[in-house]
Amino acid sequence: MKKAIGLLLAGLFLSALLGGCASSPGEEKKEEAGDEPQVYPLPVNVMGRYEESEQDMLPRFRYSLAEVHEVDGRQGIAWYDGMYYVSGSTTLSVYDAGWNCVKVNSSPFDGMETTANHIGDIDVWDGEIYAGVEYFMDGAARDLQIAVYDAETLQVKRTFPVSEESGQTEVSGITVDPDSSSVWMCCWEDGESGRYLYRYSLGDGSYLGKYHLQAPPQWIQGIVYYDGWIYITSDDGTADLGEADHIYRCRVDLESTSFSVMLERTLDDVTLQGEIEGISVDRGAGRMLISYNRGSRIVLGMVRGLYEGYEGEIHEVFVYDMYPGN
């Protein structure tokens, strides 16, 4: 009897062992099909912690206000080959080295197939002006595109539509990054679209992806690429309360999906707090250029009246000497 029970138990054990090693029909089918279980979230891909690096967290430059120049455009500023280029909402202008206006295009949308009424911050590269163009009204934009102008004639040469796949809903600024053959764009809107920088091919204008800003500045107005970094102007100060706007920066790392954002400069030395706009770097003189407006009240990105004592909005470019280190 004991021998029979022992044989029975041994048989049950062997059956369980073999059953545990065998795959079920469903599992065999899944393995044969080559399906792999997807694991979310993905492993952390950020190398290093910016908050623990004094070199990364502190400003890259010290700034000293050198000059202030009144210009005719309220949106953007760019330096190229000794000349200064200024964008208004509906104009493009060129200034010589002495800040004298030498040429204006008052009809920059002529020849475009889509409706446009707004140019943001601009950049100039290889004899061409790059501009983000759109139709903008009361905080909402449509018909976003990249417009490329001849820097000599100020006439449009070609345009590229902004990718719907990108999710970008407004374009406030643009900059050329020759090191990676890229064109970068930013969004002013204070929502999901404003939390990214958008990358396009400098060659054919094709969309190359977007990069998450962590943490994103509020109301981004302009960007400029300089020496591996993108500098960002943010209209995050409330002018009615005398709060200053700011410049931020992030390192370009195409292997990452996100860019960590650091504070670079508080603009507490402008004539009067108002609305920061475009940004550029005079690479010849080692100076940062900041476009700034004062005198008008801004609601949803639109001029809605003037402050007391002003008969019109004043557009100025603040020129800062840049000194490496802290």
Regions found by a protein language model. Give the residues of each.
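Beta-propeller domains
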Residues: L42-S53, Y85-M112
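A short helix->beta-strand "capping" segment at the edge of beta-propeller domains
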Residues: V44-V71, V261-L263
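Beta-strand-rich domains and repeat architectures in extracellular enzymes and scaffolds
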Residues: Y63-T90, H118
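Repeated scaffold domains used in trafficking and secretory/extracellular systems
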Residues: V71-A78, E113-D123, E165-V176, P216-V224, ...
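Short coil/turn segments that connect the beta-strands within blades of beta-propeller domains
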Residues: D81-G82, D126-G127, D179-S181, D227-G228, ...
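Structural motif
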Residues: T91-D96, D138-A147, E192-R199, A239-R251, ...
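Blade-loop segments of beta-propeller domains
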Residues: C101-F136
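Loop/turn-rich, solvent-exposed surfaces of beta-rich toroidal or solenoidal domains
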Residues: A215-S256
